Amino acid sequence: MNYLFKNGRYMNAEGTIVATDLLVQDGKIAKVAENITADNAEVIDVNGKLIAPGLVDVHVHLREPGGEHKETIETGTLAAAKGGFTTICAMPNTRPVPDCKEHMEDLQKRIKEKAHVNVLPYGAITVRQAGSEMTDFETLKELGAFAFTDDGVGVQDASMMLAAMKRASKLNMAVVAHCEENTLINKGCVHEGKFSEKHGLNGIPSVCESVHIARDILLAEAANCHYHVCHVSTKGSVRVIRDAKRAGIKVTAEVTPHHLVLCEDDIPSADPNFKMNPPLRGKEDHAALIEGLLDGTIDMIATDHAPHTAEEKAQGIERAPFGITGFETAFPLLYTNLVKKGIITLEQLIQFLTEKPADTFGLEAGRLTEGRTADITIIDLEQEEEIDPTTFLSKGKNTPFAGWKCQGWPVMTIVGGKIAWQKESALV
């Protein structure tokens, strides 16, 4: 099916929002211009809505295989499509871990059969993410590994991390890291700060993250490796990354919507839906994240979509697993709380969610350019809705944002020229 989207707005190559039509033919973007006509295309009048590149998320947890009670590839990618995401990168904390030929082939088969959006899987750095034996990077790359990471457990052994970075560098691949120094975690469930002190909870200190990033940056410099930092959350981490970039070290970084919108002062009680890793930090950390995003220290926004069951989250803040869902709330949360408040522009938000992650990892995504694959999101910037977890397509309903009123909701997502998700009656 060919589609002609009429009367839309999009961000052009100069970074300006302008009026446009957009023609999709044979799964590709055929033309982007005003007043397009086409004979054999279904015309969809978007009536002034934003035509954006499909959103790109480099940090997601789909749980399959092994955690299908939390999420599946089918439910997770449907939720991604509803949130406007057309390309997502799946972390390897599955069971089994994609750490060998057999496991990666099985994962890719599942993705091919079930995914509603483009899914790029990470390969594990070490076997079973155990930190002691390196995986076969060459084989994992041949089988489509997006990059290499041990995700939420991190690589604690510096010699192992250096060896991994050297091998990744030879393959022109990135090493991606969740940064925590295990000896400093302190069995924490929240940030070590006012909230932990008030509620008598063990806290995770900020230096737990920043000291690990500092170590890895020096290792990346020695290995000449592209090193990407997951979900930056502290003022110290921003400073270390900024200094590294000024020194010419190949480091990039992401921040989550929840760390841009919330800090520890916003946690109303010991609610497990506010438990994520890294935890919500202090006001100074929150301000540093905004500053880092604006000055280029932080390159992109990624959701860290981490679904859990209601039963798991009901165990209380100390026992419940870390993580919140992110796909279906990311854009409206950021548009309402950053763009509408004048902290960043709409153009910047689009870049942080599209071309910045795509360019960082060399993906053919993130731009509405003629000839490219038609991965597109239509967003109604005027639509206001209340976040209601019962409407989520994700199995995970674990969000701290229930009841928040937000503007700027995706209404249609196109993947490879086909409609992957559409809000009922939004475009008629």
Curated annotation (Swiss-Prot):
Cofactors (names): Zn(2+)
Cofactor: record remark: Binds 2 Zn(2+) ions per subunit.
Keywords, in A-Z order: Hydrolase, Metal-binding, Pyrimidine biosynthesis, Zinc
Documented EC number(s): 3.5.2.3
SUPFAM superfamilies: Composite domain of metallo-dependent hydrolases (SSF51338), Metallo-dependent hydrolases (SSF51556)
GO molecular function term, any single one: zinc ion binding
One term under GO cellular component: cytoplasm
Keyword Metal-binding carried by entry: yes
Residues the record marks as active site: 304
Catalyzed reactions: (S)-dihydroorotate + H2O = N-carbamoyl-L-aspartate + H(+)
Entry-linked InterPro entries: Amidohydro-rel, DHOase, DHOase/Allantoinase_Hydrolase, Dihydroorotase_CS, Metal-dep_hydrolase_composite, Metal_Hydrolase
One BP annotation, GO: 'de novo' UMP biosynthetic process
Role description: Catalyzes the reversible cyclization of carbamoyl aspartate to dihydroorotate.
Protein name: Dihydroorotase
Encoding gene (name): pyrC
